[in-house]
C-alpha cells in the first residue's frame, strides 16, 4: 500500500517501487505496535495522511512513544496528533519546522531507527544518542551505510 514490493532473497531483501502509494493509510496496529514509529515517520515523509489505531501499548514501551513521535515530528514540521491515548493521526497539516532539528531518541532504539530515513530527505539531520540501536540491532548504522553506497 505504500507503493513498495518486498521480496526476500538468499542475499537479503529487495525493495521495488510498484507504483503510486495510497493517498491515505488507516491501520489497526494492535498486533504490530513496534512497527508504528516506522510507519508514522514514513507516511509523513511520503506525505501520506494516516490514522493508526490500537497503539495503547506505545505509552508503556521504552518511552511514551506516542508523545515522543509527536514531539520529534513537530520539529520536522509535521502536525501529528493523538486521540484517546491509542490513536495517532495526521491529516497532512504542516507546522513550522525547526531549521536544524536534533531528533531525541528517548533511550528508545526504535525511535533512532524510525527517524534514520529522514536523513535522506534532510541531509545533516542529527539523531541524538544514535547508539541506542545496539539494544536490538547493533549493526544498524553499518547496514544502513551499505545500503546507501
For each of these PLM feature ranges, what is it?
Residues 61, 90, 97-99, 111-114, ...:
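Short active-site-adjacent structural elements
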Residues 11-12, 55-57, 85-86, 130-132:
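Short, ordered loop/turn segments at secondary-structure junctions
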Residues 25, 53-63, 69, 86-92:
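A short beta-alpha structural unit
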Residues 121, 131-135:
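A short, acidic, flexible beta-alpha connecting loop/helix-capping segment that sits on the rim
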Residues 5-7, 50-53, 127:
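Acidic/polar loop patches that form or flank catalytic/metal-binding clefts of enzymes
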Residues 1-31, 76-107, 121-122, 145-149:
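Self-splicing inteins and homing endonuclease
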Residues 31-51, 65-81, 106-125, 140-149:
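Proline/glycine-anchored alpha-helix kink/cap motifs
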Residues 5, 58-60, 133-134:
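Short, small-residue-enriched loops and turns at beta-alpha junctions
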